[in-house]
Amino acid sequence: LKTVKNKVKSRVETELAATGGLLRLAPAWVPRSFLQPGLRIKLHPDDTYAYGLNRGGIDERWFASTTVTANEGRADDEGLSYCVVGKERFTLHQAVAECGSTLVGRSIWRKYGKWPVYSKFFDNMGPIPHHMHQSAKQAKLVGQEGKPESYYFPPQHNNVGNNFPYTFMGLEPGTTKAQVRQ
């Protein structure tokens, strides 16, 4: 596919008219160097380490994403969803930037000026490190945005549980109850 870098608005409008309002998105595969893939996200096993062993195995499939990953050594477009039109592709980020409220609706466009969410299939063999996703209010306190993602674990893709369905949380010695609440 030829990658189009700019001026995608007319392509988007033509595709929306031709498909009754749909844009086809290619899968956005995301590797994680610190987790073991569960191999249930409809990626051929030979492609699990397509980015190289140093990058880790692909264990996430992002949907409708205009967000790049925060992975070390990532490709510039890692995490971005691509719209596929004929033999061309362009990022959903580009499409939203050029088409605005046509794609995301007036209220979302007015409030955020972008598409602020994405979803993912998330598939690991073992437990993930305990972590939290801050709300917009919490994240603003440290100069960040809230984490705009959701998880879905479809039962038809999870007929076998992972090999250790637990997670652990530890606190720095001296951490107070008030600090945890904060």
Regions found by a protein language model. Give the residues of each.
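Transition-metal
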Residues: 2-178
